[in-house]
Curated annotation (Swiss-Prot):
Glycans are attached at residues 58, 203. GO terms for molecular function: metal ion binding; monooxygenase activity. Its EC number is 1.14.99.56. This is AA9 family lytic polysaccharide monooxygenase G. Keywords: Carbohydrate metabolism, Cellulose degradation, Copper, Disulfide bond, Glycoprotein, Metal-binding, Monooxygenase, Oxidoreductase, Polysaccharide degradation, Secreted, Signal. Cu(2+) binds at residues 22, 107, 192.
Length: 248
C-alpha cells in the first residue's frame, strides 16, 4: 500500500487529471489477459511508479504530437517515451484490445496500428532504430460531416479498440505502436501515439515473415492529405495516412 503522503499525491493528481481533454491507454488485453498501461497523468508524479508493458512517457497533460513534430522523437512513442523493460505474450493471430482512459466524442479520426521487431532486450531499444510496419487501421467507416470514424468505433466499444496480430509474422519481441489521430481542427491534426512491448508466440501455422518497416520519424509528412482533411464537408472516402497495411 502507498504511504499516506504518496497516496494523497496520487489522489490529487487524479483529481487534476480529470480536467484533461484527452487520454492514454490505461488497460491492455492480450489474448484476453489484462495488463496495466502507463497512466500518463499519474505515474510520472510517483517516486516509484509500477513497471508496465506500456512505455513510460512524460505526457502528464494527455496531450498530442502536432504535424510540425513528425520528424522528431516525439512521434515515435509520444513525448518523453522511453522503452519499458518488461513485456507480455500474445499469440500470432491473437487478439489485442486497448482501452483508453477517456476520449472526447468530438475528436473524430483514424486509428492506426504498427509493429516493429526487436532484437535484444527491450530496455536496450533505441527508439529511432525501430522499423514499423502497419498491420491494422480503421479510417472513415461511414457518413460525412463529420462522419463515423475509427475513434468512434473505439468509443462505441467502451473506449476499447481491438486488433488481430498477423498470424504469419515470425515469433519474437515487438513494439506495438498504437495511434489515434484527431481531425476536429482542420489543418491541425493531433496524433496520440502509444507504445507497448509484446512477445509474439508462434501458432500452428508456424509463421516466419519479417515484413520490415519504416522509422516512425519517416512515416508521415505534414502535407499528407489525411492530416489536412476537412471532416466538416461532404465526402465519401478518406486517404488514411501511413503505409499500406500488411496482410497475411
Amino acid at each position: 500500500m502507498l504511504p499516506n503522503a504518496a497516496g494523497l499525491l496520487v489522489a490529487g493528481v487524479v483529481s487534476l487529471s480529470g480536467v484533461a481533454a484527452h487520454g492514454h491507454v490505461s488497460k491492455i488485453f492480450l489474448d484476453g489477459q489484462e495488463y496495466g498501461g502507463w497512466i500518463a497523468d499519474v505515474y510520472p508524479y510517483m517516486p516509484e511508479p509500477p513497471e508496465t508493458i506500456g512505455w513510460p512517457t512524460n505526457v502528464t497533460d494527455n496531450g498530442f504530437v502536432s504535424p510540425d513534430r513528425f520528424s522528431s522523437p516525439e512521434i515515435i512513442c509520444h513525448r518523453g517515451g522511453v522503452p519499458s523493460a518488461i513485456s507480455a505474450p500474445v499469440s500470432a493471430g491473437g487478439t489485442v484490445e486497448l482501452e483508453w482512459s477517456t476520449w472526447p466524442e468530438s475528436h473524430h479520426g483514424p486509428v492506426l496500428n504498427y509493429l516493429a521487431k526487436v532484437d535484444g532486450d527491450f530496455s536496450d531499444i533505441g527508439p529511432s532504430t525501430l522499423q514499423f510496419f502497419k498491420f491494422d487501421e480503421t479510417g472513415l467507416v461511414s457518413g460525412s460531416n463529420p462522419g463515423y470514424w475509427g475513434t468512434d468505433v473505439m468509443l462505441a466499444n467502451g473506449r476499447r479498440y481491438s486488433m488481430m496480430i498477423p498470424s504469419t509474422i515470425a515469433p519474437g519481441k515487438y513494439v506495438l505502436r498504437h495511434e489515434l489521430v484527431a481531425l476536429q481542427n482542420v489543418g491541425a491534426a493531433q496524433l496520440y501515439p502509444q507504445c507497448i512491448n509484446i512477445e509474439v508466440t508462434s501458432n500452428t501455422t508456424g509463421g516466419d515473415v519479417n515484413p520490415g518497416g519504416t522509422p516512425a520519424t519517416e512515416l508521415y509528412s505534414p502535407a499528407d492529405p489525411g492530416f489536412l482533411f476537412n471532416i466538416y464537408e461532404q465526402y465519401d472516402s478518406y486517404p488514411i495516412p501511413g503505409q499500406d497495411v500488411f496482410r497475411d
